[in-house]
C-alpha cells in the first residue's frame, strides 16, 4: 500500500527520494510528497495529488539542497484524497510519514486538540506528528524516548519514519505490523517499505521486526526491540536483480509477467523433483517428512488471488492425497470462533508475505492448537515467512503488476508439489505422486504452447471490451479458475464480472442470461465435460452468447464461440487454463485504455486490515 523512502547521506537527495517512490508506484497510491531538511536547516515540503510525475514537476521548479529527507506515496484510508491529507505531515520541528491505520485516531485527536494543537488534515498521520511533538515538549527527552513513549499510546498497525529538524542527522524508523527495511550504504543509509526502491543503490538490507525502533545515521545504526533493548538484526543480501524491475520489451509489467510464467514455474520446480519422481523441499530441512506424516487435516487461509489458488488445491488434497481440506478467507478466519480438527496443519498463502489479514490470521492461529503452520510465499524476507514454523518459497521472481499472474501459477505449482510430498511422506499411492511429478515437469512447455494462441484471445477481448457485465463458469477445480478469471477482469478493466460453479447456473444466475452478458466457460476434456455441454445448451436456448475455453469444438449452436486450446493433462489443467484468462483480462483492459499495472483503488501489498 503506501510507500516510504528515506535517506541520510552526504549528497543532495531530493531526486533520489523521488526515484525511490517512483519504483514503489506498483504498490498503489493516490498522492505523493517529500520533505527535505535543506542546508540552511529549513524544512522544504512538496506534496501533490496524482502521479509521482506531478511531484517531479513541482520539485524540478525548486532547487532543493539537502542530505536528509523522506518521501511517501499515499493510499487513502483516513481522509479524502487531497493535498492537505498527503504526507509528509509536520508538527513544528517533527516530520512524519506513516503506513498503516491508527485505530484510536479519534480519541488521540480529541486529546491533542485540548492541548491546543490545530489540525490541517483528516489523517491519522498528523495525529502521530502532533503526539510526538507534545511528548517531546512535555518531557524534553531524546527523540528515541519520545517515540518509545508515544507508540505506547497508539492502537493499530503502522510503520513510520520520523525526522527532527532540531537533530537533522538521523532518521528514526518504527515498525508495528507494516513492513519497513533499512538499506545499508557506504557512509549513507536508507529506509524503505520495499527493497525495490533501493536496489539501484544497495543490495544489503536489514529487515525491522515487530516492535523495532531504529536510529539511522550516515555511519551508524542502532535498533531497539519492543522491550527497548538494543539488538542486532541480521543483514540480508538481496538476490533480486535491479534489471528484473524493468519492463524490457513489454508495454506493461503484467504482460511481461504473464510471459515469464514458463520460466517462473521452471524455477519453482528446480531442485525439487528427485530422480525417483519424488518431491523435496530444502526449506523444510530434516523435519520435512515428519510434518506431513502426522497431518490428518489441512486448513488454508488466504486473500484475493491466493484464496483462489487455495480453493483449487482443496480439490487436489482431497482427491489425490485423501486429506480433508478447508479454505477460508483470512479476514473471516480471524473474526470468528473456530473448531480446530485433530492434527490439522495450517497453511497460509501470500505473494508478498506482508498481507495484513493473512498475518493476523497466522497470529490468531497460534492460540488454537494447530499441529503447526506452514506458509507458501514468494518473499523469503517477509513477515509471514519469519513468523511461520515452516515455509516453502514459490520462486516466482519479482512481480510488480498489481494483478497477480506468475505468483498465482507458481502458488498452484507448489501446492500440487505439496500434495505429492504428503503422499510420499505417508508412503501411500506412490503412482499418484509419480504422475504429479511427471505432469508438472511438462507444464512450462504446455504454457509456452498456449502463449502462442494470444492473438486468438486478443481478438475475443476486442470483441467483448465494450460489455458492462460478464459471467464466468467452471466445474470442479475449474470453478476457482473461473473465480480468478472474473477477479482479473474486475481488477484491471473495471468490468463487473461474477463467477459461479456451472451447476449453480439454474439456481439463480440463469435469470441474467441474455445477448448482452457474455458467458465465459472453462470446459476442458474431463469427466465433467458432458455436464458443461448441458449448461451451454441452457444458455444458448435463452439467447445467451457463450465463449468456451476448451480443447474440444463446440459448434452445435451459432451462439457458441470456441477458443480452441491444446490438450493438457487433467492434473495441471487448472494452471494451464489460468493463462488464457489472464491474457483475456489484459487485452480487454488494453483495449479500454486502463492503467493495467496500477488499477484504481488497488494496492499490490495490502498491509492494513
From Swiss-Prot:
It is found in: Cytoplasm. Its EC number is 2.6.1.16. It is an enzyme of class 2 (transferase). InterPro entries: GATase_2_dom, GFAT, GFAT_N, GlmS/AgaS_SIS, GlmS/FrlB_SIS, Ntn_hydrolases_N, SIS_dom, SIS_dom_sf. The active site is at 2 (nucleophile), 604 (for fru-6p isomerization activity). GO terms for molecular function: carbohydrate derivative binding; glutamine-fructose-6-phosphate transaminase (isomerizing) activity. This is Glutamine--fructose-6-phosphate aminotransferase [isomerizing]. It comes from Buchnera aphidicola subsp. Acyrthosiphon pisum (strain APS) (Acyrthosiphon pisum symbiotic bacterium). The lineage of its organism: Bacteria, Pseudomonadati, Pseudomonadota, Gammaproteobacteria, Enterobacterales.
Amino acid at each position: 500500500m503506501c510507500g516510504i523512502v528515506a535517506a541520510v547521506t552526504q549528497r543532495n537527495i531530493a531526486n533520489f527520494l523521488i526515484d525511490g517512490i517512483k519504483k514503489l508506484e506498483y504498490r498503489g497510491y493516490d498522492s505523493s510528497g517529500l520533505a527535505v531538511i535543506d542546508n540552511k536547516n529549513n524544512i522544504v515540503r512538496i506534496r501533490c495529488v496524482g502521479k509521482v510525475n506531478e511531484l517531479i514537476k513541482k520539485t524540478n521548479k525548486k532547487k532543493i539542497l539537502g542530505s536528509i529527507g523522506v518521501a511517501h506515496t499515499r493510499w487513502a484510508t483516513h481522509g479524502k484524497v487531497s493535498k492537505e491529507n498527503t504526507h509528509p505531515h509536520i508538527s513544528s520541528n517533527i516530520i512524519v510519514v506513516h503506513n498503516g491505520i491508527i485505530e484510536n485516531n479519534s480519541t488521540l485527536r480529541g486529546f491533542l486538540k485540548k492541548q491546543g494543537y490545530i489540525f490541517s488534515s483528516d489523517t491519522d498521520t498528523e495525529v502521530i506528528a502532533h503526539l510526538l511533538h507534545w511528548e517531546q515538549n512535555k518531557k524534553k527527552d531524546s527523540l528515541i524516548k519520545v517515540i518509545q513513549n508515544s507508540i505506547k499510546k497508539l492502537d493499530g498497525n503502522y510503520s513510520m519514519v520520523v525526522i527532527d529538524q532540531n537533530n537533522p542527522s538521523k532518521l528514526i524508523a518504527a515498525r508495528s505490523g507494516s513492513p519497513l527495511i533499512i538499506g545499508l550504504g557506504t557512509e549513507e543509509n536508507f529506509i524503505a517499505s520495499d527493497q525495490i526502491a533501493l536496489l539501484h543503490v544497495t543490495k544489503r538490507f536489514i529487515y525491522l521486526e515487530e516492535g523495532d525502533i531504529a536510529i539511522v545515521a550516515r555511519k551508524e545504526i542502532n535498533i531497539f526491540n519492543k522491550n527497548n533493548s538494543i539488538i542486532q538484526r541480521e543483514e540480508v543480501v538481496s538476490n533480486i536483480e535491479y534489471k528484473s524491475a524493468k519492463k524490457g520489451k513489454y508495454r506493461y509489467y503484467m504482460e511481461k509477467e504473464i510471459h515469464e510464467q514458463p520460466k517462473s514455474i521452471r524455477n519453482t520446480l528446480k531442485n525439487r523433483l528427485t530422480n525417483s519422481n519424488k518431491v523435496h523441499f530444502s526449506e523444510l530441512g530434516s523435519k520435512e517428512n515428519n510434518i506431513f506424516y502426522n497431518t490428518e487435516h489441512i486448513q488454508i487461509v488466504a486473500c484475493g488471488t491466493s484464496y483462489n489458488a487455495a480453493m483449487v488445491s482443496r480439490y487436489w488434497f482431497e482427491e489425490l492425497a485423501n486429506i480433508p481440506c478447508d479454505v477460508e478467507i483470512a479476514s473471516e478466519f480471524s473474526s470468528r470462533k473456530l473448531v480446530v480438527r485433530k492434527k490439522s496443519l495450517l497453511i497460509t498463502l501470500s505473494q508478498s508475505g506482508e498481507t495484513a489479514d493473512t498475518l493476523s490470521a497466522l497470529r490468531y492461529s497460534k492460540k488454537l492448537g494447530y499441529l503447526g503452520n506452514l506458509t507458501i510465499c514468494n518473499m523469503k524476507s517477509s513477515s509471514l515467512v519469519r513468523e511461520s514454523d515452516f515455509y516453502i518459497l514459490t520462486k516466482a521472481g519479482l512481480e510488480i503488476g498489481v494483478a497477480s499472474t506468475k505468483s498465482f501459477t507458481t502458488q498452484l505449482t507448489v501446492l500440487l508439489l505439496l500434495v505429492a510430498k504428503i503422499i510420499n511422506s505417508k508412503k501411500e499411492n506412490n503412482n499418484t505422486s509419480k504422475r504429479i511429478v511427471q505432469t508438472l515437469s511438462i507444464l512450462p512447455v504446455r504454457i509456452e504452447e498456449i502463449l502462442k494462441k494470444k492473438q486468438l484471445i486478443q481478438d475475443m477481448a476486442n470483441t467483448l471490451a465494450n460489455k458492462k457485465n460478464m459471467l464466468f463458469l467452471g466445474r470442479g477445480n475449474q470453478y476457482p479458475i473461473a473465480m480468478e478469471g472474473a477477479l482479473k477482469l474486475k481488477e484491471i478493466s473495471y468490468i463487473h464480472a461474477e463467477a459461479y460453479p456451472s451447476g449453480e447456473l439454474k439456481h439463480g444466475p440463469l435469470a441474467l442470461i441474455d445477448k448482452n452478458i457474455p458467458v465465459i466457460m472453462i470446459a476442458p476434456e474431463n469427466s465433467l465435460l458432458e455436464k458443461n455441454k448441458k449448461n451451454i445448451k441452457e444458455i444458448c436456448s435463452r439467447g445467451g452468447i457463450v465463449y468456451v475455453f476448451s480443447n474440444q469444438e463446440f459448434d452445435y449452436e451459432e451462439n457458441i464461440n470456441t477458443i480452441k486450446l491444446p490438450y493438457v493433462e487433467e492434473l495441471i489443467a487448472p494452471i494451464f487454463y489460468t493463462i488464457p484468462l489472464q491474457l483475456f483480462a489484459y487485452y480487454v483492459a488494453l483495449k479500454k485504455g486502463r492503467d493495467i499495472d496500477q488499477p484504481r483503488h488497488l494496492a499490490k501489498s495490502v498491509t492494513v486490515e
